[in-house]
UniProtKB/Swiss-Prot annotation:
Catalytic activity field: ATP + H2O = ADP + phosphate + H(+)
CC cofactor: Mg(2+); Mn(2+)
Quaternary assembly: Homodecamer; each decamer is made up of two conformers of VP2, called VP2A and VP2B. 12 homodecamers assemble to form an icosahedral capsid. Interacts with protein mu-NS; in viral inclusions.
Protein name per its UniProtKB record: Inner capsid protein lambda-1
Location of region: Disordered: 1-147
Compartments in which it is found: Virion
Domain of life from the UniProt record: Viruses
Family under the similarity heading: Belongs to the turreted BTV-fold inner capsid family.
InterPro entries per UniProt: Lamba1_VP3 (IPR054176), Lambda-1/VP3_sf (IPR044949), Znf_C2H2_type (IPR013087)
Zn-finger segments (C2H2-type): 181-203
Amino acid sequence: MKRIPRKTRGKSSGKGNDSTERADDGSAQLRDKQSSKVTQNVKEPGTTLKEQYKTRPSLQTVQKATENAELPMQTNDEGAVDKKGNTKGDKTNEHVEAEVNAADATKRQAKDTDKQKAQVTYNDTGINNANELSRSGNVDNEGGDNQKPMTTRIAEATSAIISKHPARVGLPPTASSGHGYQCHVCSAVLFSPLDLDAHVASHGLHGNMTLTSSEIQRHITEFISSWQNHPIVQVSADVENKKTAQLLHADTPRLVTWDAGLCTSFKIVPIVPAQVPQDVLAYTFFTSSYAIQSPFPEAAVSRIVVHTRWASNVDFDRDSSVIMAPPTENNIHLFKQLLNNETLSVRGANPLMFRANVLHMLLEFVLDNLYINKHTGFSQDHTPFTEGANLRSLPGPDAEKWYAIMYPTRMGTPNVSKICNFVASCVRNRVGRFDRAQMMNGAMSEWVDVFETSDALTVSIRGRWMARLARMNINPTEIEWALTECAHGYVTVTSPYAPSVNRLMPYRVSNAERQISQIIRIMNIGNNATVIQPVLQDISVLLQRISPLQIDPTIISNTMSTVSESTTQTLSPASSILGKLRPSNSDFSSFRVALAGWLYNGVVTTVIDDSSYPKDGGSVTSLENLWDFFILALALPLTTDPCAPVKAFMTLANMMVGFETIPMDNQIYTQSRRASAFSTPHTWPRCFMNIQLISPIDAPILRQWAEIIHRYWPNPSQIRFGAPNVFGSANLFTPPEVLLLPIDHQPANVTTPTLDFTNELTNWRARVCELMKNLVDNQRYQPGWTQSLVSSMRGTLDKLKLIKSMTPMYLQQLAPVELAVIAPMLPFPPFQVPYVRLDRDRVPTMVGVTRQSRDTITQPALSLSTTNTTVGVPLALDARAITVALLSGKYPSDLVTNVWYADAIYPMYADTEVFSNLQRDMITCEAVQTLITLVAQISETQYPVDRYLDWIPSLRASAATAATFAEWVNTSMKTAFDLSDMLLEPLLSGDPRMSQLAIQYQQYNGRTFNVIPEMPGSVVTDCVQLTAEVFNHEYNLFGIARGDIIIGRVQSTHLWSPLAPPPDLVFDRDTPGVHVFGRDCRISFGMNGAAPMIRDETGMMVPFEGNWIFPLALWQMNTRYFNQQFDAWIKTGELRIRIEMGAYPYMLHYYDPRQYANAWNLTSAWLEEISPTSIPSVPFMVPISSDHDISSAPAVQYIISTEYNDRSLFCTNSSSPQTIAGPDKHIPVERYNILTNPDAPPTQIQLPEVVDLYNVVTRYAYETPPITAVVMGVP
């Protein structure tokens, strides 16, 4: 009887008996049909199509004939001479000899087939005659009747036995070592072929006594179908820039913005138009009659107001404008944006919040001026007064209107007016370009100095911002080096250097800036898994895109299909493990999420979920529990759980309860306590740390398991990543360019990797398999297992032990490189603490962020829960997903490592915004320092900072008040830099009144590691402080008056301004006869017509008349009472009250001095609107300045300022020669120092005392290309 040809690799297929051998009835027709089906498209390598149809030798014949075919592969002993004279390692000779021997054995087997023909013949009549011998083909394996057609049964049997994958020649199950016979499964050496056959049978590689289990086949089918089209096995070929960029960066900050207009934030506004009689109309409007443009407004009164970028020409609007209306209008809204209840009066603001609102206004002022002055080119002026100066060419159709404002000295008229007199006194040659050629090396020079209208404060802010960007600038050579370092040389980066091209590429960031930004990210995570989990998912997707490793679960199914099991077995180990590894109801992205977790072991602890542990602790007698233990043992080393080793140990200890006992030193954490509960270092059993405490007699398996863990648990290592010299490093507890790994790292093969069984994870898997074999071999633990089940289990473990998966080698060689390549570009840089392996004393127990300096005693009363943030996120992973990936990894057949990574990595580095995260870190650092500085101005944080605004009223901000203020700072920074995601949000929770940022982690032994990043300095903070110092001198320009006000009747015909009152009208606490109305003062009304008496601050009863001083708070709390009692005395002039304000917004009401004016209506309305939580803008009545004689009428003033607060007045009667009546002011030459003083250096400024309105402005002609525009990458 002929044997149906089977695919073989020179050995048994591993499926036991050939079930079709019993079903073969000798029919030539059936043999032909089966041969045509079996051999279709299944051609063994090295054989012809004709040879495929020849009958094949028996299993033992082929084994003996090909015993030397793979000797060098099995013994790994190349170069030695075997017993037949062949050189080991010469695969050509050995394979040819094996093929010849196999062919001879086949011929001998074919000759013997005629002698083995059946003695019983069959005919078709037997089917209908029960008394005749029926055909054996109608009987199934159990002896029952089988009505399926023979062709169907043969096809089913063939598909169950024969692999659909091409066979490989030369993989026999055994090989001769020269000194014995070696098993290729466990490498054991036997002394005779019979001993070897018996040994091979123990692995489940039986000959004709067993057959492939239908249970295995069913589970293989279900296993393959369940994995079909699963995302983990789909390798995406799409590595386009856009999709990769979405994973690598969030918003691109708007760091570089340009302004081609005027560099000024202060605008001269006409307040009152010129009022002149008809007889001098032509004289006054001489310049208008001849269409001569004036550099300044021609008005009776003009003032300076804040209006950022009022003459700008920008490429992007930072949307942080500070626009102040003229003082004749109400500007109270600028001082009530923050910390003012919506129920307050529309016209009022809380005076205790003035300082916070002023600080916010100054921050907006600075943010709206973070522009670079753009170089726009020049043209020579042909007008006579500029002496051929080179004036800047402005873009836009309305450029002409700006020249008179930019260059006041271009005007020249014989008219007599304050404007013309000012122009005549100017230095004529300080106009236009200054001391710099326009062309440099054939291109526009990178910077140029220009004399033009600008204010010194805006020029200083933009100059500091430009200097900050210049410090961040990197040249193409540095870019080339940095990108090559980050890409580990897999991408060839070149940078052609062109000296004539001026580039500004601000990507250099310091370590301190990145560390501060990293701490903010860590605080953002806190203990919230929903924040970090998307980050890990994105990294896992990115790893899948660039990795050559492909997860192919058919490797597992094909391996299990070679396991031999008896048909009489009630349990199937191979079927059981296949069922365990199916992807139902599991997140099978856990494998690459676990790899991503390696980058963040300082804040994320990846653990194995409870469902992966044996149910209720499990039992060693359960096959299901044994596979749970196997899956768990393979997956645990890939997690970042520092307690993973003890969990692995206790998992088996749980299963051994009742069989083996180990000494446990904790009454709560006993041997029966679930292994997942051992999640902290104090729960580690002493016997696990000192395995000598485990008796090798009472607990031999657990002693062996503990020894395996201590010896074979993977060893941590590290790899270089990033370019900290250029891009900085966010590492906090590790060196700047070190990336830690929980397993050993070996250099990768730069060409084609080959299968390697010497890596740590493969050794670990082998030891786990050997341990399980010891378990199943011992009848003490498996008393109910039959020998067939034990053999099947051992065979399954041997298959898993030597499964041809590339994943362990990938994890040791390529995965670290992939992590190191993508780590420098991640929005969340790696945050790691050292991996400790089995060193319990070094296990990190706490990672926290502190906002307060511990060495400062005088701190606000803060709660530790709001100033210290403990971070840490446990992230549960499915052990089955990790184990599937470990057992089923493969590489593309044509893989060349360096070529693969060049193609995969290049699109990431070719993205134009790949390193925008560095700029974001710089902005985060700026925002943090700005917040700390500003909060220190309104609360006591002991942070060393100059407080220029202490004279402005403010309460001592609480945590909630400071948080509201911090929220506005955060919003302003995000708006200015065009950011939509989180910036300072982590600092808004808790208490933002911080003095420093520090992070620490503590080990189990009590040792604490603290990192306090040094604040590297913030240009935004410096600019805000500069603006505050200027505000301290030039507060009137910002709509704020300083000092107090005096309420009392003053009638006069003298045309003076209440913002600059005569000195004799002002009194203070030191003035004789002045009384102070304190908090404990009382009013005693007189009896029988006597005047009321008041007990003053000294306790004396004095009449309520004369000069008094009231604190503003006292007036606010008693506003209704005081208004009713004091208005009569104030109106009659018998009572004058000085209200101590400190600082206050004001509003001007101009009146015609020729008409009688009384300010009581303004005063009474203002008094009525005062409330305990708000005050309106203080109204002042000011006469209009006149350039001719007038008849002045009496004016009654009720509110005057105690200090000079008229610095915002620019000029009166600017189109006239002089002011005759009313306040008089000429164009302030002190604000045009370099234009009017020939001895002043051209670059001299007078900040912070005076804001100059004409300066030298440096303008730049830089290009700002992305990194990818100046380097050429070759994939």
